Swiss-Prot record:
Organism: Homo sapiens (Human)
PANTHER family noted in UniProt: TESTIS-EXPRESSED PROTEIN 44
Main location: cytoplasm
UniProt-recorded name of the protein: Testis-expressed protein 44
Biased composition (Polar residues): 53-65
GO annotation, cellular component aspect: cytoplasm
Disulfide bonds: none
Sorted UniProt keywords: Cytoplasm, Phosphoprotein
Compositionally biased residues, Basic and acidic residues: 192-207
Modified sites of kind Phosphoserine: S333
Length: 395
Protein backbone atom coordinates (compact mmCIF):
# COMPACT_ATOMS: atom_id res chain seq x y z
CA UNK A 1 0.00 0.00 0.00
CA UNK A 2 1.60 3.23 -1.19
CA UNK A 3 1.05 6.46 0.69
CA UNK A 4 0.16 9.58 -1.22
CA UNK A 5 3.13 11.81 -2.03
CA UNK A 6 5.71 9.09 -1.51
CA UNK A 7 6.91 6.70 -4.19
CA UNK A 8 6.94 3.00 -3.33
CA UNK A 9 10.52 2.60 -4.41
CA UNK A 10 11.85 5.17 -1.99
CA UNK A 11 10.21 3.47 0.96
CA UNK A 12 11.69 0.12 0.00
CA UNK A 13 15.12 1.66 -0.48
CA UNK A 14 15.00 3.29 2.92
CA UNK A 15 14.02 0.01 4.54
CA UNK A 16 16.88 -1.78 2.84
CA UNK A 17 19.29 0.87 4.02
CA UNK A 18 18.10 0.84 7.61
CA UNK A 19 17.93 -2.91 8.01
CA UNK A 20 21.19 -4.68 8.90
CA UNK A 21 22.70 -7.26 6.58
CA UNK A 22 21.48 -10.82 6.93
CA UNK A 23 18.13 -9.92 8.52
CA UNK A 24 14.77 -10.19 6.80
CA UNK A 25 13.11 -6.94 5.79
CA UNK A 26 9.87 -7.73 7.66
CA UNK A 27 11.58 -7.26 11.06
CA UNK A 28 12.40 -3.50 10.68
CA UNK A 29 11.54 -1.49 13.86
CA UNK A 30 7.95 -0.37 13.53
CA UNK A 31 8.17 2.72 15.76
CA UNK A 32 10.66 4.37 13.43
CA UNK A 33 8.44 3.58 10.44
CA UNK A 34 5.43 5.13 12.16
CA UNK A 35 7.32 8.35 12.87
CA UNK A 36 8.63 8.39 9.30
CA UNK A 37 5.08 8.13 7.95
CA UNK A 38 3.83 10.83 10.34
CA UNK A 39 6.44 13.33 9.11
CA UNK A 40 4.83 15.32 6.29
CA UNK A 41 8.03 16.95 5.08
CA UNK A 42 9.41 15.58 1.81
CA UNK A 43 13.15 15.57 1.71
CA UNK A 44 15.70 13.76 -0.29
CA UNK A 45 17.87 12.78 2.65
CA UNK A 46 15.46 10.00 3.97
CA UNK A 47 18.06 8.18 6.00
CA UNK A 48 18.97 11.13 8.24
CA UNK A 49 15.32 11.79 9.04
CA UNK A 50 14.70 8.12 9.83
CA UNK A 51 17.64 7.93 12.25
CA UNK A 52 16.64 11.13 14.04
CA UNK A 53 13.05 9.99 14.45
CA UNK A 54 14.22 6.62 15.80
CA UNK A 55 16.38 8.25 18.46
CA UNK A 56 13.47 10.38 19.67
CA UNK A 57 10.99 7.51 19.65
CA UNK A 58 13.13 4.99 21.54
CA UNK A 59 12.30 6.26 25.08
CA UNK A 60 8.59 6.35 24.18
CA UNK A 61 8.65 2.73 23.03
CA UNK A 62 10.44 1.69 26.21
CA UNK A 63 7.85 3.47 28.38
CA UNK A 64 4.93 1.86 26.53
CA UNK A 65 6.31 -1.60 27.02
CA UNK A 66 6.22 -1.20 30.85
CA UNK A 67 8.54 -2.48 33.54
CA UNK A 68 7.15 -6.01 33.41
CA UNK A 69 8.16 -6.92 29.84
CA UNK A 70 11.95 -7.09 29.52
CA UNK A 71 11.97 -8.80 26.12
CA UNK A 72 12.45 -5.57 24.11
CA UNK A 73 16.13 -4.70 23.55
CA UNK A 74 17.07 -1.03 23.88
CA UNK A 75 19.55 0.01 21.17
CA UNK A 76 22.90 1.34 22.28
CA UNK A 77 23.70 5.02 21.84
CA UNK A 78 26.91 4.34 19.95
CA UNK A 79 25.25 2.41 17.13
CA UNK A 80 23.52 4.09 14.29
CA UNK A 81 21.50 1.13 13.13
CA UNK A 82 18.91 -0.25 15.67
CA UNK A 83 18.95 -3.83 16.80
CA UNK A 84 16.18 -6.31 16.30
CA UNK A 85 13.02 -5.54 18.36
CA UNK A 86 10.84 -8.58 19.08
CA UNK A 87 7.04 -8.21 19.12
CA UNK A 88 5.47 -7.83 22.59
CA UNK A 89 3.28 -10.94 22.51
CA UNK A 90 2.52 -13.02 25.65
CA UNK A 91 4.91 -15.95 26.01
CA UNK A 92 3.57 -19.46 25.60
CA UNK A 93 5.41 -20.75 28.70
CA UNK A 94 4.36 -18.55 31.64
CA UNK A 95 6.86 -17.67 34.31
CA UNK A 96 6.52 -19.07 37.86
CA UNK A 97 5.15 -15.72 38.99
CA UNK A 98 2.39 -15.89 36.41
CA UNK A 99 1.55 -19.48 37.34
CA UNK A 100 1.26 -18.64 41.03
CA UNK A 101 -0.92 -15.62 40.24
CA UNK A 102 -3.17 -17.70 38.02
CA UNK A 103 -3.55 -20.31 40.73
CA UNK A 104 -4.40 -17.74 43.37
CA UNK A 105 -6.71 -15.45 41.39
CA UNK A 106 -7.97 -16.37 37.88
CA UNK A 107 -9.50 -12.90 37.40
CA UNK A 108 -6.11 -11.23 37.91
CA UNK A 109 -4.57 -13.66 35.39
CA UNK A 110 -7.15 -12.73 32.76
CA UNK A 111 -6.58 -9.02 33.33
CA UNK A 112 -2.82 -9.45 32.94
CA UNK A 113 -3.36 -11.29 29.65
CA UNK A 114 -5.70 -8.53 28.44
CA UNK A 115 -3.07 -5.93 29.35
CA UNK A 116 -0.38 -7.85 27.46
CA UNK A 117 -2.67 -8.21 24.44
CA UNK A 118 -3.38 -4.48 24.45
CA UNK A 119 0.37 -3.77 24.67
CA UNK A 120 1.05 -6.11 21.75
CA UNK A 121 -1.25 -4.06 19.51
CA UNK A 122 1.65 -1.65 18.99
CA UNK A 123 3.56 -4.16 16.89
CA UNK A 124 0.99 -4.39 14.11
CA UNK A 125 2.32 -3.34 10.67
CA UNK A 126 2.51 0.43 10.72
CA UNK A 127 2.32 0.89 6.97
CA UNK A 128 -1.29 -0.45 7.04
CA UNK A 129 -2.53 2.10 9.60
CA UNK A 130 -2.92 5.83 9.41
CA UNK A 131 -1.32 8.53 11.47
CA UNK A 132 -4.28 9.09 13.82
CA UNK A 133 -4.84 5.40 14.50
CA UNK A 134 -1.19 4.77 15.39
CA UNK A 135 -1.03 7.72 17.78
CA UNK A 136 -4.19 6.47 19.52
CA UNK A 137 -2.80 2.92 19.76
CA UNK A 138 0.47 4.23 21.21
CA UNK A 139 -1.37 6.21 23.89
CA UNK A 140 -3.47 3.24 25.03
CA UNK A 141 -0.58 1.17 26.59
CA UNK A 142 0.46 4.18 28.64
CA UNK A 143 -2.86 4.09 30.51
CA UNK A 144 -3.36 0.32 30.55
CA UNK A 145 -0.42 -0.68 32.83
CA UNK A 146 -1.56 1.89 35.35
CA UNK A 147 -5.17 0.73 35.36
CA UNK A 148 -4.34 -2.99 35.28
CA UNK A 149 -2.85 -3.28 38.80
CA UNK A 150 -5.72 -1.27 40.24
CA UNK A 151 -8.30 -3.73 38.88
CA UNK A 152 -7.28 -6.67 41.12
CA UNK A 153 -7.19 -4.43 44.17
CA UNK A 154 -10.73 -3.24 43.41
CA UNK A 155 -11.85 -6.81 42.90
CA UNK A 156 -10.19 -7.88 46.16
CA UNK A 157 -11.88 -5.00 47.97
CA UNK A 158 -15.27 -6.04 46.59
CA UNK A 159 -14.65 -9.67 47.62
CA UNK A 160 -13.61 -8.61 51.12
CA UNK A 161 -16.70 -6.43 51.33
CA UNK A 162 -18.93 -9.34 50.29
CA UNK A 163 -17.24 -11.67 52.81
CA UNK A 164 -17.50 -9.13 55.60
CA UNK A 165 -21.16 -8.38 54.88
CA UNK A 166 -22.57 -11.65 56.40
CA UNK A 167 -20.39 -11.18 59.48
CA UNK A 168 -21.67 -7.66 59.87
CA UNK A 169 -25.23 -8.88 59.37
CA UNK A 170 -24.76 -11.53 62.07
CA UNK A 171 -23.27 -8.96 64.39
CA UNK A 172 -26.22 -6.68 63.65
CA UNK A 173 -28.62 -9.49 64.55
CA UNK A 174 -26.78 -10.14 67.80
CA UNK A 175 -26.69 -6.42 68.63
CA UNK A 176 -30.34 -6.05 67.77
CA UNK A 177 -31.22 -9.03 69.98
CA UNK A 178 -29.22 -7.52 72.84
CA UNK A 179 -30.95 -4.14 72.41
CA UNK A 180 -34.39 -5.72 72.42
CA UNK A 181 -34.94 -5.99 68.67
CA UNK A 182 -35.66 -9.73 68.59
CA UNK A 183 -36.18 -11.69 65.39
CA UNK A 184 -39.27 -13.75 64.58
CA UNK A 185 -37.94 -16.72 66.55
CA UNK A 186 -37.32 -14.63 69.66
CA UNK A 187 -40.78 -13.08 69.30
CA UNK A 188 -42.41 -16.52 69.06
CA UNK A 189 -40.44 -17.71 72.13
CA UNK A 190 -41.57 -14.67 74.12
CA UNK A 191 -45.14 -15.21 73.00
CA UNK A 192 -45.15 -18.88 74.06
CA UNK A 193 -43.64 -17.93 77.44
CA UNK A 194 -46.42 -15.38 77.95
CA UNK A 195 -49.06 -17.97 77.08
CA UNK A 196 -47.55 -20.42 79.59
CA UNK A 197 -47.56 -17.70 82.23
CA UNK A 198 -51.24 -16.98 81.52
CA UNK A 199 -52.30 -20.67 81.71
CA UNK A 200 -50.23 -22.39 84.44
CA UNK A 201 -50.51 -26.07 85.32
CA UNK A 202 -50.47 -26.40 89.12
CA UNK A 203 -50.33 -29.80 90.93
CA UNK A 204 -53.14 -28.66 93.30
CA UNK A 205 -55.46 -25.63 93.48
CA UNK A 206 -53.25 -23.77 95.95
CA UNK A 207 -50.10 -24.03 93.82
CA UNK A 208 -48.99 -20.91 91.95
CA UNK A 209 -47.45 -20.64 88.50
CA UNK A 210 -43.71 -20.13 88.44
CA UNK A 211 -42.42 -17.10 86.48
CA UNK A 212 -40.42 -17.97 83.37
CA UNK A 213 -37.46 -15.71 84.12
CA UNK A 214 -36.49 -17.29 87.47
CA UNK A 215 -33.24 -19.13 87.97
CA UNK A 216 -33.13 -22.93 88.65
CA UNK A 217 -32.30 -22.28 92.33
CA UNK A 218 -35.40 -20.13 92.74
CA UNK A 219 -37.50 -22.74 90.94
CA UNK A 220 -36.20 -25.47 93.29
CA UNK A 221 -37.05 -23.33 96.32
CA UNK A 222 -40.57 -22.81 94.99
CA UNK A 223 -40.99 -26.55 94.43
CA UNK A 224 -39.91 -27.26 98.02
CA UNK A 225 -42.40 -24.67 99.27
CA UNK A 226 -45.18 -26.23 97.20
CA UNK A 227 -44.34 -29.68 98.62
CA UNK A 228 -44.54 -28.21 102.13
CA UNK A 229 -47.96 -26.81 101.31
CA UNK A 230 -49.03 -30.24 100.06
CA UNK A 231 -47.87 -31.90 103.27
CA UNK A 232 -49.75 -29.30 105.34
CA UNK A 233 -52.86 -29.83 103.23
CA UNK A 234 -52.86 -33.62 103.60
CA UNK A 235 -51.58 -33.79 107.20
CA UNK A 236 -52.87 -30.85 109.27
CA UNK A 237 -50.92 -30.12 112.46
CA UNK A 238 -52.46 -31.52 115.70
CA UNK A 239 -53.86 -29.13 118.29
CA UNK A 240 -51.65 -27.97 121.13
CA UNK A 241 -51.38 -30.29 124.13
CA UNK A 242 -52.60 -33.38 122.31
CA UNK A 243 -50.73 -36.40 121.02
CA UNK A 244 -50.74 -36.74 117.27
CA UNK A 245 -52.60 -39.91 116.34
CA UNK A 246 -51.17 -42.43 113.95
CA UNK A 247 -52.16 -41.86 110.35
CA UNK A 248 -55.19 -43.80 109.27
CA UNK A 249 -55.46 -45.98 106.20
CA UNK A 250 -56.42 -42.97 104.10
CA UNK A 251 -53.58 -40.79 105.40
CA UNK A 252 -50.84 -42.61 103.54
CA UNK A 253 -48.24 -41.31 101.16
CA UNK A 254 -49.13 -40.74 97.56
CA UNK A 255 -48.52 -43.74 95.30
CA UNK A 256 -48.98 -46.39 98.05
CA UNK A 257 -51.93 -48.66 98.94
CA UNK A 258 -52.59 -51.25 101.68
CA UNK A 259 -51.80 -54.90 101.06
CA UNK A 260 -54.58 -57.09 99.74
CA UNK A 261 -54.67 -60.65 101.09
CA UNK A 262 -56.62 -61.84 98.08
CA UNK A 263 -53.53 -61.31 95.91
CA UNK A 264 -51.67 -64.06 97.78
CA UNK A 265 -54.35 -66.76 97.53
CA UNK A 266 -54.66 -69.24 94.70
CA UNK A 267 -56.53 -67.76 91.76
CA UNK A 268 -57.67 -71.18 90.55
CA UNK A 269 -57.86 -74.54 92.26
CA UNK A 270 -55.57 -77.36 91.27
CA UNK A 271 -56.44 -81.06 91.48
CA UNK A 272 -53.16 -81.88 93.21
CA UNK A 273 -53.70 -79.13 95.78
CA UNK A 274 -57.28 -80.28 96.37
CA UNK A 275 -56.21 -83.88 96.93
CA UNK A 276 -53.42 -82.97 99.32
CA UNK A 277 -55.68 -80.62 101.26
CA UNK A 278 -58.27 -83.35 101.56
CA UNK A 279 -55.64 -85.72 102.97
CA UNK A 280 -54.37 -83.24 105.53
CA UNK A 281 -57.38 -81.13 106.55
CA UNK A 282 -60.13 -83.71 105.90
CA UNK A 283 -61.69 -81.37 103.39
CA UNK A 284 -61.35 -79.80 99.96
CA UNK A 285 -60.01 -76.32 99.43
CA UNK A 286 -57.11 -74.24 98.16
CA UNK A 287 -53.92 -72.99 99.80
CA UNK A 288 -54.65 -70.93 102.91
CA UNK A 289 -51.38 -70.54 104.82
CA UNK A 290 -47.68 -71.26 104.80
CA UNK A 291 -48.17 -74.25 107.13
CA UNK A 292 -49.95 -76.15 104.39
CA UNK A 293 -46.99 -75.68 102.08
CA UNK A 294 -44.59 -76.91 104.79
CA UNK A 295 -46.79 -79.93 105.51
CA UNK A 296 -46.94 -80.71 101.80
CA UNK A 297 -43.19 -80.63 101.55
CA UNK A 298 -42.95 -83.15 104.40
CA UNK A 299 -45.62 -85.36 102.90
CA UNK A 300 -43.72 -85.51 99.66
CA UNK A 301 -40.68 -86.80 101.61
CA UNK A 302 -42.65 -89.22 103.72
CA UNK A 303 -46.40 -89.56 104.19
CA UNK A 304 -46.04 -91.48 107.49
CA UNK A 305 -44.27 -88.61 109.29
CA UNK A 306 -46.89 -86.05 108.23
CA UNK A 307 -49.70 -88.38 109.26
CA UNK A 308 -48.04 -88.99 112.64
CA UNK A 309 -47.74 -85.23 113.28
CA UNK A 310 -51.37 -84.58 112.43
CA UNK A 311 -53.13 -87.65 113.86
CA UNK A 312 -51.20 -88.16 117.11
CA UNK A 313 -52.06 -86.20 120.22
CA UNK A 314 -48.42 -85.76 121.26
CA UNK A 315 -46.92 -82.34 121.50
CA UNK A 316 -43.18 -83.07 121.29
CA UNK A 317 -40.92 -85.19 119.18
CA UNK A 318 -39.71 -87.19 122.23
CA UNK A 319 -43.23 -88.39 122.92
CA UNK A 320 -43.52 -89.54 119.35
CA UNK A 321 -40.24 -91.46 119.62
CA UNK A 322 -41.14 -93.21 122.89
CA UNK A 323 -44.66 -94.01 121.84
CA UNK A 324 -45.58 -97.38 120.43
CA UNK A 325 -46.12 -97.22 116.76
CA UNK A 326 -45.45 -99.22 113.66
CA UNK A 327 -43.13 -96.72 112.09
CA UNK A 328 -41.87 -94.50 114.94
CA UNK A 329 -39.21 -96.28 117.14
CA UNK A 330 -36.23 -95.23 119.17
CA UNK A 331 -32.66 -95.93 118.13
CA UNK A 332 -31.95 -98.58 120.83
CA UNK A 333 -35.05 -100.51 119.94
CA UNK A 334 -34.02 -100.47 116.33
CA UNK A 335 -30.53 -101.73 117.22
CA UNK A 336 -31.94 -104.52 119.46
CA UNK A 337 -34.28 -105.71 116.80
CA UNK A 338 -31.44 -105.81 114.32
CA UNK A 339 -29.20 -107.80 116.68
CA UNK A 340 -31.94 -110.29 117.51
CA UNK A 341 -32.69 -110.76 113.88
CA UNK A 342 -29.00 -111.39 113.17
CA UNK A 343 -28.61 -113.90 116.00
CA UNK A 344 -31.76 -115.70 115.10
CA UNK A 345 -30.69 -115.89 111.54
CA UNK A 346 -27.30 -117.20 112.52
CA UNK A 347 -28.70 -119.88 114.82
CA UNK A 348 -31.28 -120.95 112.36
CA UNK A 349 -28.66 -121.14 109.69
CA UNK A 350 -26.36 -123.28 111.77
CA UNK A 351 -29.15 -125.69 112.80
CA UNK A 352 -30.26 -126.05 109.24
CA UNK A 353 -26.69 -126.84 108.25
CA UNK A 354 -26.39 -129.49 110.93
CA UNK A 355 -29.65 -131.01 109.88
CA UNK A 356 -28.46 -131.17 106.34
CA UNK A 357 -25.23 -132.88 107.39
CA UNK A 358 -27.14 -135.36 109.53
CA UNK A 359 -29.40 -136.19 106.69
CA UNK A 360 -26.46 -136.80 104.42
CA UNK A 361 -24.78 -139.07 106.97
CA UNK A 362 -27.96 -141.02 107.55
CA UNK A 363 -28.37 -141.67 103.86
CA UNK A 364 -24.76 -142.81 103.62
CA UNK A 365 -25.19 -145.14 106.60
CA UNK A 366 -28.36 -146.63 105.25
CA UNK A 367 -26.79 -147.34 101.92
CA UNK A 368 -23.77 -148.90 103.59
CA UNK A 369 -25.88 -151.25 105.73
CA UNK A 370 -27.96 -152.24 102.75
CA UNK A 371 -24.88 -152.98 100.81
CA UNK A 372 -23.49 -155.23 103.55
CA UNK A 373 -26.77 -157.13 103.82
CA UNK A 374 -26.99 -157.67 100.11
CA UNK A 375 -23.46 -158.99 100.12
CA UNK A 376 -24.17 -161.45 102.95
CA UNK A 377 -27.26 -162.69 101.20
CA UNK A 378 -25.34 -163.24 98.03
CA UNK A 379 -22.71 -165.25 99.80
CA UNK A 380 -25.14 -167.36 101.69
CA UNK A 381 -27.18 -168.10 98.62
CA UNK A 382 -24.22 -169.23 96.57
CA UNK A 383 -22.35 -171.26 99.15
CA UNK A 384 -25.24 -173.42 100.38
CA UNK A 385 -26.22 -175.20 97.09
CA UNK A 386 -22.69 -176.24 96.35
CA UNK A 387 -22.29 -177.96 99.74
CA UNK A 388 -25.53 -179.85 99.19
CA UNK A 389 -24.35 -181.25 95.91
CA UNK A 390 -21.02 -182.32 97.40
CA UNK A 391 -22.57 -184.26 100.37
CA UNK A 392 -25.73 -186.13 99.31
CA UNK A 393 -26.12 -187.50 102.82
CA UNK A 394 -26.36 -183.93 104.15
CA UNK A 395 -30.13 -184.27 104.73
Amino acid sequence: MALPGYPLGNVDDSRSKDSPAGEPQGQVPLTADVLAVSSSVASTDWQDIDQASFKTATPRAISTSGDKDKSAVVPEHGQKTPRKITPLLPSQNPSPLQVSMSLQNPAWDRQVQDARTSQSLVVFPSHLLGKDKMSQMASVPEREPESAPSAPSAELQSTQHMEAQPVESDADHVTAGANGQHGPQAASTTKSAEEKAEHPKAPHPEAEALPSDESPVAMGANVVDSLGDLQTWFFPPPPAGSVSPSPGPHEVALGRRPLDSSLYTASEENSYMRSMTSLLDRGEGSISSLADILVWSETTMGMAIATGFLDSGHSTVADLLHSSGPSLRSVPSLVGSVSSAFSSGLVSGTSSALRTITRVLETVEQRTVEGIRSAMRYLTSHLTPRQAQADPNYD
